[in-house]
Amino acid sequence: MALQRTQAFLLLLLLTLLGLGLVQPSYGQDRMYQRFLRQHVDPDETGGNDSYCNLMMQRRKMTSHQCKRFNTFIHEDLWNIRSICSTTNIQCKNGQMNCHEGVVRVTDCRETGSSRAPNCRYRAKASTRRVVIACEGNPEVPVHFDK
């Protein structure tokens, strides 16, 4: 419980620093960074089962109008995720060269195919695997989960 509070505090602190302009991606990059955080970052280690996916997909607003078919939650602290942006650039799926890869703990949530929004249902798969994220800005921050 104390670890969760600490991680939540650190995330809140970072968001506050962003708001104060002390860590300053551009406005467009900031919006994309905030979206990345909302859709993909959950430092809790409680992921891994179907109930987790059902709850988190709804909480993070990915089931309002239609069921998002697939989403990955990264279970690492924000600094570990941001450090991926300092690794060697690799090519993204769209051909751009602003992607980076790292190995992290994740929960992949895949929609079952038989549910309808807003009552979407997901199957979970927890693993430690290689991920590819796109980063932008100065300093670079993650803005897109590529694979």
Curated annotation (Swiss-Prot):
Name its GO BP terms in alphabetical order: antibacterial humoral response; defense response to Gram-positive bacterium
Function recorded in the entry: Cleaves preferentially after uridine bases. Has antimicrobial activity against uropathogenic E.coli (UPEC). Probably contributes to urinary tract sterility.
Signal peptide span per the entry?
1-28
Keyword DNA repair: yes or no?
Answer: no
Tell me which residues bear Pyrrolidone carboxylic acid.
Q29
Compartments, as annotated in UniProt: Secreted
Q: Which protein is depicted?
A: Ribonuclease 4
Family matches, as PROSITE patterns: RNASE_PANCREATIC
Q: What Pfam families does the annotation carry?
A: RnaseA
Give all cystine bridges in this chain: C53-C109, C67-C120, C85-C135, C92-C99
Q: Which residues form the active site?
A: H40, H144
EC number(s) of the enzyme? 3.1.27.-
Q: What keywords sit in the KW lines?
A: Antibiotic, Antimicrobial, Disulfide bond, Endonuclease, Hydrolase, Nuclease, Pyrrolidone carboxylic acid, Secreted, Signal
